[in-house]
């Protein structure tokens, strides 16, 4: 069985006749990077939210959608929407505190993430002073700190300049190669991204 699989999957919002999401067939293998491409309004974000197991989406489903991942990190399109604390170091450990990680283990995990992402110069910074690229870097680092098997990124570079966007995609490939995390990315465009991914799925 594929790590993530959909067959004739449809999702309908309440009182809607046409599906917000339709996927005839999708198979995503564990440890790969998959790019979902499609225009605005085609259902990419709704599909990602369903893959992430979000329970707050009301609606009706048809067909099958299965996800074998244990743990999922979700990175939003707008870097500011995800940051909830005022210090970079606090942001990284926020999720670890929520799952009740022991203090010493949390310190070790923080040190590992800082080293892996090269955050030594940012760790004591106020999150409000970070650039858009630095904020998205922090969001990805915070998600990976939770040791997820799956990372979902919803247009993670849409609000970044080309240099910052390239750095984020280099980082995504590095994460995949070093940690084996399965990564699903949604974008509106295909240009310049083919080299970063293993498979492209069009919606």
Predicted regions and their residues:
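Conserved catalytic motifs of ABC-family nucleotide-binding domains
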Residues: 147
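Conserved ABC ATPase "signature" region
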Residues: 104-122
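A short, flexible loop at the N-terminus of ABC-type nucleotide-binding domains that lies
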Residues: 1-6, 10-23, 55-58
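Conserved ABC ATPase signature
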Residues: 126-130, 134
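Catalytic Walker B motif of ABC-type/P-loop ATPase nucleotide-binding domains
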Residues: 151-154
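H-loop/switch region of ABC-family ATPase nucleotide-binding domains
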Residues: 187-188
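Hydrophobic anchor residue at the start of the ABC signature
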Residues: 140
């Amino acid at each position: 069985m594929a790590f993530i699989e959909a067959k004739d999957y449809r999702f309908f919002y309440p009182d809607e006749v046409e599906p917000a999401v339709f996927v005839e067939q999708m198979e995503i293998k564990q440890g790969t990077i998959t790019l979902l491409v499609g225009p605005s309004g085609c259902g990419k974000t709704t599909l990602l939210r369903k893959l992430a197991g979000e329970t707050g989406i009301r609606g009706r489903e048809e067909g099958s959608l299965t996800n074998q991942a244990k743990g999922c990190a979700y990175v939003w399109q707008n870097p500011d929407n995800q940051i909830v604390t005022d210090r970079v170091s606090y942001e990284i450990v926020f999720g670890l505190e929520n799952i009740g990680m022991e203090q010493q283990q949390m310190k070790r995990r923080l040190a590992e993430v800082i080293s892996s992402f090269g955050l030594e110069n940012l760790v004591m910074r106020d999150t409000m002073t970070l650039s858009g690229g630095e904020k998205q870097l922090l969001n990805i680092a915070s998600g990976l700190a939770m040791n997820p098997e799956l990372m979902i990124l919803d247009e993670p570079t849409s609000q970044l300049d080309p240099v910052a966007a390239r750095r984020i995609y280099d980082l995504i490939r590095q994460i995949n190669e070093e940690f084996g995390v399965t990564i699903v990315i949604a974008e509106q465009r295909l240009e310049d991204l083919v080299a970063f991914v293993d498979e492209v799925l069009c919606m």
